[in-house]
From Swiss-Prot:
Changing residue 602 to A: Impaired interaction with SQSTM1/p62. Changing residue 380 to M: Impaired interaction with NFE2L2/NRF2. Kelch repeats lie at residues 327-372, 373-423, 424-470, 471-517, 519-564, 565-611. Residues 184-286 form the BACK domain. Changing residue 288 to A: Abolishes repression of NFE2L2/NRF2-dependent gene expression. Slows down degradation of NFE2L2/NRF2. Knockin mice die approximately three weeks after birth because of impaired ability of the BCR(KEAP1) complex to ubiquitinate NFE2L2/NRF2. Component of the BCR(KEAP1) E3 ubiquitin ligase complex, at least composed of 2 molecules of CUL3, 2 molecules of KEAP1, and RBX1. Interacts with NFE2L2/NRF2; the interaction is direct. Forms a ternary complex with NFE2L2/NRF2 and PGAM5. Interacts with (phosphorylated) SQSTM1/p62; the interaction is direct and inactivates the BCR(KEAP1) complex by sequestering it in inclusion bodies, promoting its degradation. Interacts with NFE2L1. Interacts with BPTF and PTMA. Interacts with MAP1LC3B. Interacts indirectly with ENC1. Interacts with SESN1 and SESN2. Interacts with HSP90AA1 and HSP90AB1. Belongs to the KEAP1 family. It is found in: Cytoplasm; Nucleus. This is Kelch-like ECH-associated protein 1. The modification S-(2-succinyl)cysteine is found at residues 38, 151, 241, 288, 319, 613. Changing residue 415 to M: Impaired interaction with NFE2L2/NRF2. It comes from the Eukaryota. The modification S-nitrosocysteine is found at residue 151.
Amino acid sequence: MQPEPKLSGAPRSSQFLPLWSKCPEGAGDAVMYASTECKAEVTPSQDGNRTFSYTLEDHTKQAFGVMNELRLSQQLCDVTLQVKYEDIPAAQFMAHKVVLASSSPVFKAMFTNGLREQGMEVVSIEGIHPKVMERLIEFAYTASISVGEKCVLHVMNGAVMYQIDSVVRACSDFLVQQLDPSNAIGIANFAEQIGCTELHQRAREYIYMHFGEVAKQEEFFNLSHCQLATLISRDDLNVRCESEVFHACIDWVKYDCPQRRFYVQALLRAVRCHALTPRFLQTQLQKCEILQADARCKDYLVQIFQELTLHKPTQAVPCRAPKVGRLIYTAGGYFRQSLSYLEAYNPSNGSWLRLADLQVPRSGLAGCVVGGLLYAVGGRNNSPDGNTDSSALDCYNPMTNQWSPCASMSVPRNRIGVGVIDGHIYAVGGSHGCIHHSSVERYEPERDEWHLVAPMLTRRIGVGVAVLNRLLYAVGGFDGTNRLNSAECYYPERNEWRMITPMNTIRSGAGVCVLHNCIYAAGGYDGQDQLNSVERYDVETETWTFVAPMRHHRSALGITVHQGKIYVLGGYDGHTFLDSVECYDPDSDTWSEVTRMTSGRSGVGVAVTMEPCRKQIDQQNCTC
């Protein structure tokens, strides 16, 4: 017998026998045989150690495509699902167990864990619509599914039942896109029932953010009293004022008054009633029939009315803080000349946004927020062409990134202080040329009108202003002759000012704010030096005490409170216009420098409100 030849170099296909072949001609009957070993020796290279790898990228898709064709032609199927749902006639679907098990942990357990279905050719399925099961089976073979609004809840429920997580996520994402004031509560309830945590959270967040619109829908009026109380207790409810929550509760009770009037008191205790204005409470006590019919509720609101009008310190109630970014806004300022900048600082990531400029450059202005809108009040335009004191009031809307002019004050006010009580802006002191004002005027946004109120007991420019317990405090300043350490308090019900305990230090151009039921006065100018000292006024003990000093000396600084901490921005240290921003933590009594402004400046207007609409910013910054 001839020895088999040893081959070298590239093999020729004719020299290899196929795995299955017919016997050579003349070798007897033609039968199929298997070649059990390779008869050829191949040495592609000198050492013979080279290897290669090959992957057919779309093999899985092709293989599942073939299996789907087998399913549709009912070939090699090893299970029939008999699906029964309520009164709908049962439907049968033939499939391959291995494919179903590969897409669903429920089917995998059913067909592999020794359950009785493992050996069954016909398996009964209940609790899922046949059309839903048909789509899920098709998804198992094709990795594709098409779902419309009318059936998405059924498909998602079926996907949850059979733990097909990818379909659950797809349905959840679709439903999030469909969220609307009219369906958000229903979607949230559905997600809770099927245990879809992510969809439930997204729907609830939508409800919190759009509470005013949701509260007008039919779904809202179908909430139970417990569900409503839980909803309105949320700190992150997005409302412009607490009266929205109050009216929503009263409307819910009116929807079925005979059955719901018993829940009024419980609901009112969930409303932040101390955030309501005395005028609003007085109107409701006089005109709301539901309150007049419930003596306990009426007494409860009367007590709150008295506490507000008597300016009693109340137990701290968390402010509504919607989960929308809240930024620190800085408007205007001075560096060589007055600036028109509007910028916003995000303490959570340290970023700055450049926004729509003021229509006229201003420094020595004040900033405040009412109903989410930022107001820039007074100031002066210092320019190479001359100096002009301003009586202007401009309103910035973060949703449109636009400024709108409002009614002007009765007189120009440079180096002004402002505070907000009951949604009204109080403009305090300031100067017009060589005139130093003691006058104070109040702006009502609903009417776009200013009205003079009682003047301060002392003329003050560079005055620090803050509001605590519905009282307006004017702190320090300059009267035209002397820098001041005196402070006074305005009682709106009496329309009168009273002196309070003076500060330990003379301060003009200090930053003044309220934190944790105390008034803070930071920095300023004492007639000789810019200051870095900080003192705090306790309204209950009527005493001023020093706290930790700032890192930098500064006067004409901006100041505000964000998430329980004090921020001071810019100012003048006697030599330089500062760009530094410091943050005070009352828990540790420490200051830290957290960022720098885009440029040094003093005399900025500062306030905190919602993050601006990015879409509007991008459109207005577009250069195309």
